[in-house]
C-alpha cells in the first residue's frame, strides 16, 4: 500500500467515526461496481447517505473538498443511481455528502462535511 493509499484509508476511517459520532450509521465501506466506488454508505435520520471522502496531508494541492470537481460530482451521481439499482430494498431518500479530511503530518486531522454536495 502506498503512502497516499494509506492516508486515504485512514481518512475514510476518521470520516466514518466523525459521522458515527453525529448519529450516522455505517452500512457499507468501499462499495464497488464497474463504474467506480462509493467510499462510505451510511444512514442518517431515515436517509441513505453516500459519502465521498477526500483526504490530504497538506494544502499544496488545495483543500480536500476542492478535489471534487464537476466531473467527479457527475460520476458520484451516476454511482448513486447504480447503488440504488443494486439495492432495491433500500427505499427512501438518498443524498451524497462529501467529507474533506485535512491531516497534516504530525498534526491532528480536521474534518469538514458538505451535506447534499452533489
From Swiss-Prot:
It comes from the Bacteria. Pfam families: UPF0102 (PF02021). GO terms for molecular function: nucleic acid binding. This is UPF0102 protein CMM_1377. InterPro entries: Restrct_endonuc-II-like, tRNA_endonuc-like_dom_sf, UPF0102_YraN-like. Belongs to the UPF0102 family.
Amino acid at each position: 500500500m502506498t503512502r497516499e493509499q494509506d492516508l486515504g484509508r485512514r481518512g475514510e476511517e476518521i470520516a466514518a467515526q466523525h459521522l458515527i459520532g453525529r448519529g450516522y450509521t455505517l452500512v457499507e465501506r468501499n462499495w464497488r461496481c464497474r463504474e467506480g466506488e462509493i467510499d462510505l454508505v451510511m444512514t442518517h435520520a431515515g436517509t441513505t447517505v453516500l459519502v465521498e471522502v477526500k483526504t490530504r496531508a497538506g494544502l499544496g494541492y488545495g483543500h480536500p473538498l476542492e478535489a471534487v470537481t464537476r466531473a467527479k460530482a457527475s460520476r458520484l451521481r451516476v454511482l448513486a443511481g447504480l447503488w440504488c439499482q443494486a439495492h432495491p430494498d433500500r427505499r427512501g431518500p438518498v443524498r451524497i455528502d462529501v467529507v474533506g479530511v485535512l491531516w497534516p503530518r504530525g498534526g491532528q486531522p480536521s474534518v469538514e462535511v458538505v451535506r447534499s454536495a452533489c
